[in-house]
Amino acid sequence: MFKTLQRAFQIKDIRKKIFYTFMMLVVIRLGSQLPTPGINASYIQDFFAQNTGEAFNLFNAFTGGSFEQMSIFALSITPYITSSIIMQLLTIAIPKLEEMQKEGEDGRKKIASITRYVTVILALIESTAMAVGFGRQGLLEEYNFVNAAIVVLTLTAGSAFLMWVGERITEKGVGNGISIVLVINIISRVPSDMTTLYEQFVKGKSIASAALAVLIILAIILALVVLVVILQGGERRIAVQYSQKMQGRRTY
């Protein structure tokens, strides 16, 4: 693995792609620390202290903690993911889109363009719901049209920017940009999650209990990794039977 990485860095083109991807990810993480203008920080802290459900934690993980901090990337790329799913379903249901998909590269570009517009629309809807619904409850420092509009535009622009970054990484960087953005968001939560596990199962325990808890946690993580690898690399071979064709005295 290390030899492969060493060879990759020796190739100028690949080195540029890796550096470009890295810089884009740095921009994403920096942007995740920038608070949205007009947001009441104390309300956010109280809200997440009272709402610790799995749905909020999962969404917060997808956003790399941006939702919990209500940063400019609070919506992350979730509108784009939803938009992509919607377009895939519509491609099956609407013949016009199905024909467009079969047009080759031009058709795929048209569908990608439509997906971008749908992403922005979904981001507008989600940010408006947050600004209006939670704004009345104290999310905004001052609940008025100007502050609500600023929050809506900021969150929508942040989501659109992440979509653009993902596409640029796909075009000029390494791998699928949207997937990389999603993965880096999830990975960024690992230190916080490890701290939470430490406080819940290790801190204040006896040495024996703490050691047992650490071993169990490591065993669970290892089992999950092995399971993912097995599922990813698993295969089921199916025998393929071809119909026979008679031509003269020969069978094909």
PLM feature segments, named:
Residues 1-101, 105-252:
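N-terminal cationic and glycine-rich segments that engage phosphates or anionic surfaces
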